[in-house]
Amino acid sequence: VKAIDNQPKIASMDISLLQHDEETASGSGTPSLVVVGGSNSLLKNGWADKLKEVHPDSGRVLNLSIGAATSAMGLYRLLTCASLPDDPVIIWEYALNEANYFSHRQPAKVLIHHTQWFLEICARRGFRVLPVVLYNKSEAGSAEQVKYREFLARTFAAYGLKPVDASQLWRKDFGHLPVDRLYADNPHYSVETEFPLALARTVLQQSRSATVPQRGGDLEKQFSDKDLRIVFPDSRTPEPFVNRILSCDIFPLGTDLHFSLSGRLLACFLIASRMEPAITFHSDRGQKGPYSAQISAKAGGPVRQLKHLLLWSPQDPPLVARGDLFLSPQPSLGTTPMVQHTMAWNPLEEGGAPGSGGLIGLLAEVDA
C-alpha cells in the first residue's frame, strides 16, 4: 500500500464558508448524507447536529451512529438499514473509537479489515465515502501519534479517499482555541465552541466531491470471492428491543443458540446488560471464548447497551463453521472470560436473576 499524504486538503474557512448559505440555498449539488460513527456524532449540538442545520434539507441527513464501537458496528448499521437515501455519501467517523480500541489491545489488523469491508460494501453499492477523522484530547496535545492511525491513513490512500481531518482544521482555523476548550473530556469535543459548526460546514463542502472507494490490485483480489452477512439465530423465539436509536429482535443468552452458517465468524452484536453470562461460540472446527457479555454495573450507568464483540485476531483466525454454529452460555463458577474494551465482568450468583439483554446477530464472512 502506498504511503499517505498526511496533510489532506481541508476546506478554507474564509471565502468558501462565507459563501455557504448562497451555495446551499437551493441544495444544488448537495448530496444526501449518512453518518456512521461514534459518540461524537451523537452529541446534542455536536458536529452531526450542526450538519443537519447547515444542510439545505435536514431530512436528507441520516444518522446511524452508535457510541463506543468500531467499523464492525458500522457494518451492522449499514447492512440492516432499510431506509437509506438514494445515492448517499456515507460519512465514516470511527477513527477516534478505533484508536481507543487499538490502545486497549485490539489488533490493528482486525480494525482495518473491518474498515476495508465497510469500504468494500460501499464500493459494491456505488456509495461515495467521506471519512471524518477525529482525535482524542490526549492525541491533540501530543506530538506522538497512535500507531493505528498510520495504518488507517494508508488504507484511505489505497482506496483513493481524502478524509476531513479535525486536527488539521483546528490548527489551521482555530489555533487560538486551546485544547482544554476544544474538548469536553478526552474522547469528546466540546459543543460550546464554534468548532463543531466549522467541522460540519467543512464536511458538507467536501461531501460534494466525495468519491466511491477505488479498489484495485490486491484490494480487489482480497474480497473478490467473498461476501459479508449478518446472521441471526434460527432457534427460539426472539424478544423485541426498542429504544430511541434501535429497533430489533434479541435472543436471550441463558440457553444455547443455533446459527445456520457456512463461513468465518468475525463479530457479534448484542444488547448487553449488567447480568449477562459469559458466552462461547463453537462449531465442528473449534471454539471461541468465553467472552463477557456484561456492561459496567456502576451507579448511574445504562442498564442495557448495544455492543459488539470482535471475535478473532491475527494469532487466532476467525472460527470456521460448515453449516452449524452454536453460542453457549458458560457456568458462572470458575469462568474467567475475556473482557473486551467497553465491556465488564462481575461473576454471577448461582440462581440469580437472568440478564435483560440478548444476542442480535453475527457478522460473518462467507464465500461468494
Protein language model annotation of sequence segments:
Residues P240-L261, R274-T280, K307-L310, G357-G358:
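Short beta-strands within extracellular/lumenal beta-sheet-rich domains
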Residues G46-E53, T70, D165, D225-D234, ...:
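Secondary-structure junction/capping motif
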Residues S190-E194, R201-L253:
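Charge-rich interaction segments
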Residues V179, K221, I230, C248, ...:
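Generic detector of low-complexity/intrinsically disordered segments
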Residues K2-G67, R77-D86, H258-L261, A267-H282, ...:
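Serine-esterase "nucleophile elbow" of acetyl-processing enzymes
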Residues E53-D57, M73-V212, A272-H282, Q287-D367:
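Alpha-helical cap/lid subdomain in secreted, periplasmic
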Residues S65-T70, N186:
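Histidine-bearing beta->alpha loop at or near hydrolase active sites
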Residues I10-S12, G67-A69, A108, A140-G141:
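Short, flexible loop segments at the rims of nucleotide/cofactor-binding pockets, characterized by
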